[in-house]
Amino acid sequence: MAHNEVSAAWHPALRSEDGVPSNAPVSDDLTQVSKDSMTESAAELKPSEAVIQENDLHSSSTSPDTDASVNVQSTAVPAVLDSDTPVYAEQVLNQENAQKNTAENSAQEDAPDHGQELSQTISDEPHVIETSEESAPTLGAAFGSDANGSHDTAAPDYMMDEPSPAEHDTTERREDNDAASWFNEQVDSGDRQTTNEFVNDDNQDFWGSPTNGDAGDDFFNQLKTQTKPIYIPPETESRYEEGVPLLDNTVESPVQPSMKEESQIDKIFEDDGDDEGGAFFNEVQGSVPNEGVPSPPITRKSTTQVIGSLDASPDSPVSPASSTAQEFNNILAAAASENQVKEDLSDDDLAAKWQAELSDDQPEKSTEDDLAARWQAALDDDDDLLLEDEIGKGPNNGQESLPQNPNGSVHETTQATLSSPFGTPQSSARPQAQPTSYTPHQPSTSDLLQGIPGIAPQSSAAPMQDYFAPPAQPRPTTKRAESFAERSKEGYKSPYDLPDDLTRPRKPVVTHKPVVAQPGSMPPPPRSSSIPVPPTNAPGVPTPPPAPSTVPAVTTPKNFYEELPLPPPRPRSRPASSGRYTPTANIVTSPPSHSQPPPPPPANPYASLSPPPQDSGSVGSQTQLQQPERLDPYANLLGPGAPGAPAAPSAASRYSPKPPTLQPGTKPPSAPRYSPAPPQSAAPAPPRTRYASQPSSVSSQGAVLPFQPRTSSPLAHHEKVSYQPPEGLAIRSAPESASSYAPNGMQPRPNQQDVSNSITAPVGAAGSAAVTAVPENVSAAIQPTSPPRNPYAPPAYINEFSKRVAPMASPPPAVVPPTGDAQFVPPRRSQTQSPSQQASAPGLSVPSDSLQRPASVHAPASPTKSANPYAPSQISIHNRVPSQPLEFIPPNDGQELDPLERWKGAPIVKFGFGGSITSCFPKHVPRYAAGQAAPKIKSTPGEVKIFSANDWVPITEGIVQHPGPLKNKSKKKDLVAWLSSKIAAFENEGISEAAQLHPESSKRHDEKILLWKIVRALVEHDGVLEGSAEVEKSLRYIIFPHLQNSEPESTSGVNLPAFNALPPLNAPSQSDATDSQSLESIRNSLLVGNREKAVWDAVDNRLWGHAMVIASTLDRSVWKQVVQEFVRREVKSTTGNSESLAALYEIFAGNVDESVDELVPPSARAGFQMVSKVGGQGPSKNALEGLDSWRDTLGLVLSNRSPEDHKALLALGRLLLSYGRTEAAHICFMFSRAAVFGGADDPQTSIVLLGADHQHLPLNVLQDDDAILLTEAYEYAVSVLAGSPTSTLPHLLAFKLIHACSLAEHGRKSEALQYVDAITAALNATTKPSGYHNQHLLFGVDELSARLRQTTSDSGSSWISRPSMEKVSGSMWAKFNSFVAGEDSDAASTGSGKAGDGDIGPFAKFSGTPTVSRSPSVSDFGPYSLPAAQSVPGSGPSRYQPGNQYVPNSSPEQYRGRSSLDSQRSSSFGFPFGQRRGSQEPSTPVESSMYQGGPLYGSPSAAGYQSTPPQASYMPLAPVVEDSAPQPYPVEPAPMQGSPVNISPYQPPANESFGEPLDQSSATVPASSMAGYVPPGAGGGYEPPSVEISAAPALDTTEEPTHQDVLKKKKSFMDDDDDDDLAARAAAIQKAEKARKDREADEAFRKAAEADAKRPPAAKKSWFGGWFGGAKKENDNNNNSGGPIRAKLGEENSFYYDKELKKWVNKKDPNSASVSRGTPPPPKASAPSRSASGSTAPPAASMGLGLDSRPPSSAGAPPSLSSSPAPPSLAAPPPMLGTARSASTSAAMPTPPIGSSLPPPPRPATSLSNASSIDDLLGAPQARKGTSAKGRKKGRYVDVMAK
C-alpha cells in the first residue's frame, strides 16, 4: 500500500479506495473548505499552511472529502515530482489522508511526514498546487484530485486492470511534472487563490478538496525548485496513468476560468466522495455532494441534486480546466520534447504502480476491484468491448459504489481517476472504459502511450485545461482508435458482437452515459479532427466504448464500472476504437493538438464523458433524466460496443440506440430517447460517434437508424434544446469541431444538452458563462465547451472518436453546432445505415446537413446525430468497392509511351465558326481472350458529330426580331416595334440576377427602361428631341408619367393651381414684408450709390425681391451670388424635395456647374456628411438622395430651356455617372447636346454604348447586344432618319462587327453577312475616314466576310444571299476600291479585283497587280517604301502574303488602291503584317518614303507602326499625326515634300505601271489637295512634291532630286537597306521615265499652250497630251471650285503636273493646287487618284499607313475585334486617327481618305489591271495614259493648258 497508498492519495480513484468515504458530504464541505482555504491560503496562508488547513478543513467536513482532498494533494505531488518527489507527494498525500480518514491511515501515516515536508518544502506552493489541481482538472484527476475514495476506488479497479502501479506512477509523474509547471504557472499567475476559491465554491465536488490542490502546488513548486529534471512519460501515458484526462472540470462549467475549474475540480472530487455511482455525474454538474449518501450502491443524486451541485461546479471545471489544461499540456509537451523524464519507473513499473494503486483504492470497494479485474480482462481480450461487457455486468455495482461514496467524492474520484490514468473523469463508467482502453496498454508503457499519448496529451492538456477532456482521450483514444481502425475495415461485426453482450448488462450504466454520450459524443469530433484518421473508425463508435468503460473504472469502482459498461454502447464505437483503437497513438497526436487547441479535447470529453459529468456536474437535469434509462440502453448499445459502436452513437446520440443493430434489444431507446445525457454517460462515445464517428457507427447502426427516428424524436427534441444552447458551446468548441467536424458538431449539442439541461438552471448561466469563459479557456482551445463535455464523456474516448471521425468531422469544423444539426438530418440517417452510404454520408451529410438544414435538423437532432455517426462511417467507405479499372490494350506504335495515355481515348469537343460544335467520343470495344476473366479494352475513335450551339443553348429571341442592320428609313416601323417589345420585356421580366448585384438595382432598372423609351421617342420623331411641342410632350410623358393626367388640366389652366395658391401668396407677401428700418437701410445705401451694399442688406433681411432687382443691375457675379443665397436660405430650407427646383434656379442664375451641388453637396461627394445646426434638412436625410431628383431636374430644365442649360445637363450626367447611374447619365448626355460618342480609350468620351458603363465596368460590358443595338437605333435616328449624309458614330462600326460575329457564332450567318455588307457600305460611303476605321476593323470585316463566304452551305437562307457573299468574297476591298476609285478606275480595278476574286486569298487580288501598282500601295506604307524596288516583287509579295491571303487578298486589291489597307490587314494579322510589308514594301517604298516624309507617323514611326500593328493603342496618335500630317503637308510643304519625294519614288513605280502620268499624277496629286485625299492628301506633302514638281519642264530634275531625296529618306526612314535599294531603283526607273514623260508632257503642254485652241490633237500626238486633255476636261468639270490657271509655258516652268489632280498646276498660283483639292468629289477624287493609281495609291497607302498607324494605335484592337476588347480598341484608336486622318484627307481627300482606306486598293487594282500590262505601264504608258486619262478626266486630271 505504500506506493499504492501514495497512488491512491494522489489518484482520485485510488484514494477513494483508501477509505475515504465516497459519499461525500465532504464535497460540500470540501467545497466550502476549499473555498475558505483557497481564499486564506492564497491570500493569507503559506502554501504549507494552506495545505494543512485545507486538509484539516476537508477532513473535518467529511472524511471522504478530506480524504479526497488529501488524496488529491498527494496525488498531485507524486505525479508532478520526479521519482524523488513522489516521496514528498506521498507524504503530503498520506498526511492529508490521515487527517481525512482512518481508512487511509496507512497512507496517512506515511503521508503526514511527507505531506508536512512537502508543505514545508513548498510552503507557498501547497495551496497553489491545490488551486492548480482544482483549476487543472487533469491534475486533480491524475493525482487523485478527487478526494473521494469512491472515485479513487473506481480508478484502482480500472487501474488495477490496466496500468501497473509503476505505470501509474510514471504517468502520475509525467502529468505531475506537466501539471507542476502548469500549476506553478497558475500559482504564479495568481489564479491559485481565485481558482481555489472558485473551485471550492463551484467545483470542489469534482476535485474534492482544495488541500489536494495545495499538495499539488507544493509538489509542483518543489519540482520547480528541484534541479533534477522531471521525468515525463509520453503525454499519452502520463495522461492515462495520471488520469489527467479524467479531470473533467469543464463539464461543470465551461464558462468558468481555469481557477474556477480548480475549485470545480475540488468539488468534483467531493462529489466522487459522496457517491461513486451518481456522484460522478453530480460532481460533473458541480452539485453539492450527497454527504448523506456514503453507500457505494448505484443510488445517485437526483437530477435536482446534480444540478444543485452543478450550480457550484459549472464555473471552474470548464474554464480552469481550459487554461490549466492548456498550460499543463504545454508543460507535458515541453517535458516530452525536452525528454525530461525523471520517472525511474518504466512503463511496466508505471503499469504496476497503477495496478497497485488501483488495488489499494480497490480494497475499499470490492466492486471496484472486481471491476478493475474485469476491465483488465476485457481490455486484454477486446479492450473496449470487454470493458463494455464487464461494465455491463457491473454497471449497477458501479453505480451503487458511486452512491456509496459521496457523490462528490466518488464522482470526483472517478473523474480524477479517469482524468489521470483513464482519461475521462466525466463518468465513472467512462473512466473504466478508459482504463479498459488503458488496460490493454497496461502490459506495456508503449501501449499506454499509444492509447494514453493520444489521451494523455489531451488529458495533460485537457486535465489542466479541463481535466475531463484528457481522461476521455486516454481511455477511448488508445483502444477506440485502434479497435475502430482495425475493425472499421473488418467491419463493425466484432465490435458489434461484443457490444451486444456487453450492452445488455451495461444498459443501466449506459443510461447515464448516453446522456453524457450525446454531449460527450459531440466533443469527440474536435479531437477526431485533430486525429483525422480515427474518424473513419470513430464513426464506428469504437471510441465511445472505451470512454464509458474508462469512466466507470475510474469514477466508481463498481457502479461506475457498471456504468462504464453502459458506455460500452459507446465502446461499440469504442470497440473499434479501444479494441482497435490503435489510433490512440493518433489520439496521442491529436491530444497534443487538443491540448494545444483545447477545443478538440473538450469536444471529445463531451462525447465520451461529458454526458455523465454533465448530468451530474454540468447538466444536472439532463444527467438525472438521462442517467437511469440511458445507461441501460446505451450500455446495451455500448455493450456491443465494437459492432454496436455505431449503434451506441445513435443510442447515445439520443433516440436511436438502435443504430447499433447489434443492440436492438439492448437499445432500450426509451432511456436514450428520454435522456440523451445518460446515453452520453453510457454511450458518450456513441454520441461522439454520432457526431464525430457517427458515420462509422451509422454503418453498424444502419438497421437501428430506422428505430432511432422513434427514439430520436424525444432525444431530438432534447438535443434541440440542449444542442442549440450548446450552439454557443459548440461555437466555443468550434476548434474542437474544427478538430473533428461531425463529432464535434454533435458533441457541442450534447454538451449543450448537458449544459442546457443539467446546467440549465445551475449551468444555464454557466453555459453562457462557458461561452464567455470559453474565451478564457480558449487557450485550452475549446475547453469551456469541452470541459462540460469531458466530464460527461471520457476525453480519451471523445478524442478517439473524434480522431475516428476527424476526417469526416474535420472538414466542417466550423459547423460544430451545425454538426448537431447535421446529426439532426434524418435522411442522412437512412443513408448512413448502410456502411457504404455512411462512408459517403459523413462527408456529405455532416457538412451539407449542418449547413443545408440546420433548422430542420433540430427536430431530428438525435436521428441526425445517429446519422452523423453513420455519416462518418468511413467503414462504409471501406465497404465501398472502387470500380475496377479498365485494362486497355496498349498500342504498339509508340503511343503507349504517352505519359498522358491518350491512346486510351478521350472525348474531344471543338467549337467552330457559326455556332457549330464538333464532338467525338472514343469507343471502348471489349476484347475477350482465353484465360482472361475480364476483357481488355480497345479504344477506337467514335463517331464524329456536328451540332449547332442553338441545339444545346437555344437563343432567346424576343417576339419581334431586330430589323438590323438599319440601312434606310423603311426600317423605322420595324425598329419602333422592336424597341417597344424590348421595353415591354424589361418591364415584365423585372430585375435580372446580374443587375441585382448593383446596390441600386431597382432604380437602375427603371432608368434603363426610361433610356429605351427615350430612344424610341427619338426614332419616332426622326432624331429630334426638342423644338417641337409634340416631341416635348412625348418626352414629358416619358420622364413624368404622372403628369399625363394632370397635363390636360394644366393645358386648360395650368395657372389655376397657382391662382388657387394665390391666397397663400398673401402669406409670402407678408413674409416678404419687412420693417421700415430694413427698407430705410437699403434706401440709404442706394442714396449713396452703394448698390452692392443695398443688395446684401436686402439679403440679410431676407428681402429677396429687393435684392434681386438691385442685383440685376450689377455685375452678373453678384446676381449669381444673390440667387445662390436665395436658393440656400429659402428654397432648400422649405421642403424636402426642393433639390430640383434649387438646381433650376441655379441654372437660371448662370451657376451651371454649381447647379449639381444642389442635388449632391460637394461634401457628400467627398464622403462627408455635413450637418446643419441651424435647422436644415441636411442632417435629416441622406445627402445622396438628391441623386434621385435627377429626373425632376431634367424635366424642369427641358421644360424651361436656358442658354447654358445644356452644360448643366452635362454636369448632371457626369455626376450620375460617377455614382454608377449609367442609364440616367446617358439620358442627360443625350439632352445636353454635347454628348461625346467615341471609343472607350478616349478619356473625353461620354458614351461608348448607350446603357454601358465603360468607365467603371470591364470592357466586356461593351459586348452587350442590347447596348450595341440600342446605340445603333440611336445612330439610325440621328443620321438616317434625320437625313444626315454620313454616320455620326464612326466608332460604332467596330461594335456592329462584334454583333455580326455574335450572330455568326449563333448560326445566324445570313444576318451576320448583312451586317458585314452594311459595315462595308458605311466604310465606302465615308468621305472622311475616321481613326476608328482602322486596319483592325477592315481586317475584321474582311475576315468575317471570308469566313461567311466559305460557309456557303449556310451562307444565307436563300440564294439571294450568295450574290452578296460573292461580292464580299470579291473582297470588301474590291468594293471599297470600286466605290472610291470611281467607275473609270473601277473597270480596271474591278478587273483586277475580279482577277483577285479568282484567287480566294486576300493577296489573290494582288496577283493581277504589277509591282508598280503594288508599289503605290507600298508607298502608302511609307515605312516599306524601301521595298519599292520590291514593288515589282511587291505584286508577288501581295500574293506572297497569301499567309494573310484569304482576307488580305481582297485587301491586296485595296492595297492596289491603297497599300495602307494591306498594311492594315497585315497589322491586323500582326505578323502577316510584317510579311505583307515585305511584299508591299516594294510598292510602298515611295509611298513609305513619302509616308516617312509625311508627318503622319514621322515616317519611320509609320513604318514601325505597320511593323508594330499591335500598337493599336498608339494608332490613334499616329493616325492623328498622320491626319495632322496631311493637313500639315499643305501647311508644311517640306515634310510634304519629303512625303512627296516618297510619292515621287512612289510615282516611279507608278510610272512603271502607268508611266509618266503616274509621275505627273503623283506630282499632281500633291498639288491638288485631292492628291492629299489619299496618302498624298494625308501627306499634304504632295503639295511640297507639287512644289518640287512645280516646274513641269523641270519636273524631271525636280522629281529626280525628289526621288533621290525620297530614296534617301526612304533609306533613312526605312532602315532596311534592301528596301532602300529597291526604292532607289524603283525611284530611279520611275524618275527616268517620268523625266522623259514629263519632258514630253511639257512639250505637249507647251504646244497646247501655244495653241490657244484645245490641244486634243496635240494631246493625241503625244499620249501624254491626249491623256491630260481628257483629264483637263474632267478636271474642269470636276474642279468647279477653281479651274486650273493657264500659264504660258514659255515662261518659267512654274507649272508642274499634279498626278493626283491629273493636271498641270502653277506653282505660283496656289489656287490651282487648292482648286484641285476642292475639285475632287470624294468619289471622283478617289477615281482620279485611282486613275493615277500610283499617285492615288500612295495616298491610299499613306492613308493605309494612317489606318495602319491607327490600327497600331488600336494595335490591341485587332484582337479586340476578334474579342470583346477589340471594339473599344477599334473605337478608341480611331478618335485621334480619325482626327488626323480626316485632317489629312480633309482637303480634297475627305472622300478619298475613306477611299484611301479602301479606295487605295482599287487604285492598286487599276495599277493591277495595268499591272497586268506592266510593260504598258512602264514601256507604253501612253495606252495607259488613255485609260488613265479617262480615269483622270473623271477623277481629277484637268488639262490646264486645255482651258
UniProtKB/Swiss-Prot annotation:
Signal peptide range: none
Q: Which family does it belong to?
A: Belongs to the SEC16 family.
Stretches of Pro residues bias are at 521-549, 594-614, 657-687, 1765-1776, 1790-1804
Which Gene Ontology terms of cellular component type are present?
endoplasmic reticulum exit site; endoplasmic reticulum membrane; ER to Golgi transport vesicle membrane
Q: Which InterPro entries match?
A: Sec16_CCD (IPR024340), Sec16_N (IPR024468), Sec16_Sec23-bd (IPR024298)
Q: Which gene encodes it?
A: sec16
- How is the protein disposed in the membrane? Peripheral membrane protein
Comp. bias (Low complexity): 309-323, 644-656, 760-769, 826-842, 1457-1468, 1726-1742, 1751-1764
Q: Locate the compositionally biased regions of type Basic and acidic residues.
A: 165-177, 362-372, 479-492, 1631-1655
Q: Which UniProt keywords apply?
A: Autophagy, Endoplasmic reticulum, ER-Golgi transport, Membrane, Protein transport, Transport
Species the sequence originates in: Aspergillus oryzae (strain ATCC 42149 / RIB 40)
According to the UniProt entry, which residue ranges have a biased composition of type Acidic residues? Answer: 379-389
Region described as Disordered: spans on this chain: 1-220, 269-324, 339-769, 807-872, 1385-1691, 1706-1843
Q: What does this protein do?
A: Involved in the initiation of assembly of the COPII coat required for the formation of transport vesicles from the endoplasmic reticulum (ER) and the selection of cargo molecules. Also involved in autophagy.
Q: Output this protein's name.
A: COPII coat assembly protein sec16
GO BP: any one term: vesicle-mediated transport
